[in-house]
Amino acid sequence: MQTLLVSSLVVSLAAALPHYIRSNGIEASLLTDPKDVSGRTVDYIIAGGGLTGLTTAARLTENPNISVLVIESGSYESDRGPIIEDLNAYGDIFGSSVDHAYETVELATNNQTALIRSGNGLGGSTLVNGGTWTRPHKAQVDSWETVFGNEGWNWDNVAAYSLQAERARAPNAKQIAAGHYFNASCHGVNGTVHAGPRDTGDDYSPIVKALMSAVEDRGVPTKKDFGCGDPHGVSMFPNTLHEDQVRSDAAREWLLPNYQRPNLQVLTGQYVGKVLLSQNGTTPRAVGVEFGTHKGNTHNVYAKHEVLLAAGSAVSPTILEYSGIGMKSILEPLGIDTVVDLPVGLNLQDQTTATVRSRITSAGAGQGQAAWFATFNETFGDYSEKAHELLNTKLEQWAEEAVARGGFHNTTALLIQYENYRDWIVNHNVAYSELFLDTAGVASFDVWDLLPFTRGYVHILDKDPYLHHFAYDPQYFLNELDLLGQAAATQLARNISNSGAMQTYFAGETIPGDNLAYDADLSAWTEYIPYHFRPNYHGVGTCSMMPKEMGGVVDNAARVYGVQGLRVIDGSIPPTQMSSHVMTVFYAMALKISDAILEDYASMQ
């Protein structure tokens, strides 16, 4: 009996150890000297240790015969304490060494630059994001197969992989009473990524239920689980959190349990500069990568099978361009020989965010977050008829304008994308905007235009990869509907903040406050928004997965066209935006592509 008690005590104490003690082993295992891998050969090299990179590395190395090297510019950060682990500290990490903070070009909409927040460390942006766990509309994912020809990329398959990644925690009675709704059939329970209600232990604010009451008066559904393929309505939602409320980031979940595998190595503090290509045959082949920290200190490491780019939608396309894979018009002026001519870096689609914030009465105090995924008609309200007229008459003009600005390469192909978006809006009633409510001391709405029609680009500006000189231009609001949509959604947030049951807790507006008349019309909002918004940090599309003739860079197995042994496996490849937070889809992508890689590996044995 005494032995049993002692054993139980030891187990309990071990479980209670702070994460920074439990993670000492992983930090000691990380390689920091590039000479440890320089000149070596492994089966697979992964450029980038973020969400998709670490998920794929963990999946591939389940086979002890497969060796994987992950190269990451940052370090292990999951044990940094509340600034990383506490989702309620969202934003505090911005501007630190864990934030790449990529700067855009000077934006035409306001003659200012903006910062793109992106995680620099093992786990990537799962270290710094808000942790929201929702899924897009079924029609959006289905279109990847039906419109873009990506066989196997449909809702049923992608949702199955997303559930495979998930370890869901159902809300308790208190959380359900506060506004959570849970459909067990829409969640996985045996996966790796912990997802469940955010709960500080404080009472929940009644403002969430007040919002639900206010939108129900408008015919908007409220008992919604945003994981089921139709995110329209108002509800609370899961976050990527353990039950003890510690962030469930990609390094904690995919690397920490697996770092002791002898076939998995992780090199930190190094940048992948370019892919090494062999051109002995008719088709170039990726045989490794060059990596380093600056031009005078680079190394090569070699891949027996494949190189997998997972550096994110801002950086993976630049690695391709530095490698000679991209548009001749971009590469040749920099003195880079074009090995494969592809529209790399185009089709960049990021969302925008503006804020409406109000003071609340003491009766409204408490924790709580909820989202209103609003349809096109709900977003535009009385302006809906005119907005639909734009959709029905302007698509071809918008495509021509986007191509002329360098955001895409072909008007006909872009028109197919626009018609797809119109189909979502008109025939499937997908969510067009998101009003994200946080009740932490205020009633604050972050408001997103979810489906931008504008197209931007990212391109290198120098042939030296280690200078990190590239132009990132999302071209925010250069499409008239995008500006109108962001303006209308933000106007809607102001309206709902002081409507119906919400009025009970309204104690005056602080943002926009006096910066915009309370009775401002939509035209006034379109003048206000360009100077009072931020990027949403959800850029996709820069190495789009679609047919070459439509502007694709990779095929439906994420293989780069015209190159053997090279894939892009990150947020660069979705060909469209989504009415969702993107993590659920990115985890599904990583697992689905991993299976494709493993199938190819098995066929070679």
From Swiss-Prot:
FAD binds at residues 51-52, 72, 125, 129-130, 132, 272, 571, 583. Optimum temperature is 37 degrees Celsius. Its EC number is 1.1.3.4. Its main location: secreted. Gene3D superfamilies: FAD/NAD(P)-binding domain, Glucose Oxidase, domain 2, Glucose Oxidase, domain 3. The active site is at 538 (proton acceptor). Glycans are attached at residues 65, 111, 183, 190, 280, 377, 410, 495. GO terms for biological process: secondary metabolite biosynthetic process. Optimum pH is 5.5 to 6.0. Changing residue 442 to G: Optimizes the charge-charge interactions at the surface of the protein 3D-structure. The keyword Metal-binding does not apply. Keywords: Cell wall, Cytoplasm, Disulfide bond, Extracellular matrix, FAD, Flavoprotein, Glycoprotein, Oxidoreductase, Secreted, Signal. PROSITE patterns: GMC_OXRED_1, GMC_OXRED_2. It catalyses: beta-D-glucose + O2 = D-glucono-1,5-lactone + H2O2. Changing residue 334 to Y: Contributes to facilitate the inter-helix hydrophobic interaction. The high specificity, high turnover and high stability of glucose oxidase make it an ideal enzyme for biosensor applications and such as the detection and quantitation of glucose in industrial solutions and body fluids. Glucose oxidase is used in the food industry for removal of residual glucose, e.g., desugaring of dried egg products, and as an antioxidant in the production of beer and soft drinks. Its cofactor is FAD. O2 binds at residues 559-560. Disulfide bonds join 186-228. Residues 1-16 form the signal peptide. SUPFAM superfamilies: FAD-linked reductases, C-terminal domain (SSF54373), FAD/NAD(P)-binding domain (SSF51905). Glucose oxidase catalyzes the oxidation of beta-D-glucose to D-glucono-delta-lactone and hydrogen peroxide in the presence of molecular oxygen. D-glucono-delta-lactone is sequentially hydrolyzed by lactonase to D-gluconic acid, and the resulting hydrogen peroxide is hydrolyzed by catalase to oxygen and water. This is Glucose oxidase. The lineage of its organism: Eukaryota, Fungi, Dikarya, Ascomycota, Pezizomycotina.
